[in-house]
Amino acid sequence: MFRRYKLKNFDFLLVLLVIALNVIGILAIGSAKQSVQSKQILGMAVGLIAMLVIAFLDYSRLLKLAWIGYLFVIVTLILVHFFGRSANGAARWLDLGFFDLQPSETAKILLILFYAQFIMKYREQFNTMRVLLLAVLFIIPPLILIYKQPNLSTTILVSVLFCVLMFVGGLSWKIIGGVLAVAVPSVLIFLSIVMQEGQTLIKDYQRNRIMAFFDPATYADTEAYQQLNSVIAIGSGQLWGKGLNNTDIASVKNGNFLPESQTDFIFAIIGEELGFIGSAVVIL
């Protein structure tokens, strides 16, 4: 199961970069919301152990578990539909006692593993109609289950991930061109429909988020509140930032203008407290 590994071949630079990004993340989350910092530290420890274990695994044997991974995705997504813990109107987490599992997140990794095995198995017939239909059929169940949580953003992300995997797998340009010729107008038509009041394709809050993305000023006090304040926070950090855990009264974070800054908006904290230099280090 494990392979012989020479330390000289180990990518220590990559490991150091991963650790550095995790440390910055822990510091930023601790500054945003102290109560969740310990959970982030635990996640980093578990993640590093998992990374080292997987690094020494024989990947060819790991790929043999791809079907188990796919079934795990489907089963956990079904379970979260019936037994999931709800937050903000969406059931996305399974409470396992010692931690919460978000199946839609594990799905991203396990679907990559599954399709890597799938592409290897059918690489000689990859551009045939039968194989492409199989690939599409396998992605439909997880997409539907994720969408029903509801989780539109992850549904879109997994769809994009699937398209990237197909491209990397060697999808012919003729097929890509045909798909784009259909997909681009379809997306535009879909957006034109869901942006209308009274539409029933998506939920109202999902429509409002789309509208806020295209016209944040109109939704400055609702859906775009954190989005716009994040921009202000990043800009206020200037070159060197205001410092981690600062007590600056003019801070966007300290003024509670980013009430959920420890979530997807954590980069706003990095921008405000570490400035352009700190933000550039994270991005680069």
Question: Where are the regions a protein language model picked out?
Answer:
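General structural signal for secondary-structure boundaries
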Residues: M1, D11, N127, K203, ...
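N-terminal membrane topogenic signal
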Residues: M1-V18, L62
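Helix-boundary and loop/linker segments of multi-pass membrane transporters
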Residues: K6-L7, V131-L132, G169, G255-L258
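Hydrophobic alpha-helical transmembrane segments of multi-pass inner membrane proteins, especially
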Residues: V15-V23, L27-L228, A268-L284
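Extracytosolic (periplasmic/ER-lumenal) interhelical loops and adjacent juxtamembrane/interface segments
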Residues: A224-N245
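Long extracytoplasmic/lumenal interhelical loops at the membrane interface
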Residues: Q238-L274
